[in-house]
Design a protein with these regions (language model features):
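Switch/coupling subdomain of P-loop NTPase systems
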Residues: 308-309
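Short beta-strand-to-loop transition segments that serve as allosteric relay/switch motifs
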Residues: 297-305
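Acidic, Ser/Thr/Gly/Pro-rich low-complexity segments that form flexible
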Residues: 285-286
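Long, basic N-terminal domains or extensions that often function
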Residues: 1-282, 291, 302
């Protein structure tokens, strides 16, 4: 059987650069843990500054059955005068069986003691908690921090954990936070937690609450805003890809807004102005007729259409 599985780890705002540096490893680390638990299957990973999300459209309710092979001492060591030696008896004890169940197999050019154990798969719900715990603690964002009385550390404090296997909440405690059927939407939409009845409902709740969960949709929205601003104002926005990745990582509801600064600053070399805008304000420089002008574009995370103030 299969069910959808949603894993959401809610955090205080993640810094963009450490997140982007670890981004290439996040999915691989999770996949490796699934494979180790005989539960590897397709999944999608999403992120916003306030959440890390794993989504399985289909996740097995039971581990695959597996086999374990055990190899012991060569037969000439395992038996003496037709009787099992302490080496053979120790091997059987290690395998949890009597000598009657022990066979032999070729290994390294010798006939050695051999035992093959059939292992029944466990229910997935019993493993999900450890999988999530191992995955989160494997992530390396560089610097980390402690909070409260915890001895463990993470890049930012974890504020909620939401793990839904179908309509069932999976009991997990991560960094002192217990899982619950709730999430948080955009702060301007609702500062309080919002209940979630099932995994599939999650995406509808976020969308209604002003959160664009998918990074590729945030990118598309920003670029569409850029095109509109360029057409309306006869300008050209310099779209730096690294800066674009950063603003995608720090917004849940991005809107590009055109601003301006005092023309006096244009007396400075353009390189100085552009570097300052990009590195210190996360602004996108604006050009007209090939020249830098006293305008910039900032990507806002505000849930509003009124940027007049």
């Amino acid at each position: 059987m299969i069910k959808p599985l949603l894993i959401e780890i809610g955090v205080e705002e993640l810094p963009a650069i450490p997140l982007l540096k670890e981004l290439k490893n996040i999915e691989k680390k999770y996949a490796d843990i699934l494979e180790k638990n005989s539960l590897l299957c397709e999944f999608e990973f999403y992120y916003t500054p306030r959440r890390l999300v794993i989504w399985h459209r289909e996740f097995k309710t039971q581990q695959d059955d597996s086999t374990e092979e055990f190899f012991g001492a060569p037969l000439e060591v395992a038996y003496k005068d037709g009787k099992a030696t302490p080496a053979a008896e120790g091997f059987a004890k290690k395998c949890g069986v009597t000598m009657d169940a022990i066979g032999s197999a070729q290994k390294g050019g010798k006939e050695v003691l051999y035992y093959k154990k059939e292992v029944a798969g466990k229910p997935s719900i019993e493993l999900i908690g450890d999988i999530v715990d191992t995955w989160i603690k494997s992530l390396d964002f560089g610097k980390s921090m402690r909070w409260g009385s915890l001895s463990e550390s993470f890049i930012r404090p974890i504020r909620w954990v939401n793990i839904l296997f179908g309509d069932e909440s999976v009991d997990v405690e991560l960094f002192g936070v217990k899982s619950a059927k709730k999430t948080f939407v955009h702060r301007i939409s609702n500062f309080n937690s919002v209940s979630i009845n099932g995994a599939k409902e999650y995406f509808e709740v976020l969308k209604a609450g002003g959160v664009t969960l998918f990074p590729e949709l945030r990118r598309e929205s920003i670029l569409n805003n850029f095109s509109l601003l360029e057409k309306e104002n006869g300008i050209k926005i310099e779209c730096d890809e690294d800066l674009l990745d950063e603003v995608i990582a720090i917004t849940e509801h991005p809107t590009a807004v055109l601003g301006s600064f005092d023309e006096e600053f244009l007396k400075l070399p353009p390189e100085v102005i552009i570097t300052s805008m990009k590195e210190h304000q996360r602004y996108f420089p604006v050009f007209k007729d090939g020249k830098l002008i006293n305008k910039f574009v900032v990507v806002s995370n505000a849930l509003t259409d009124d940027f007049s103030k």
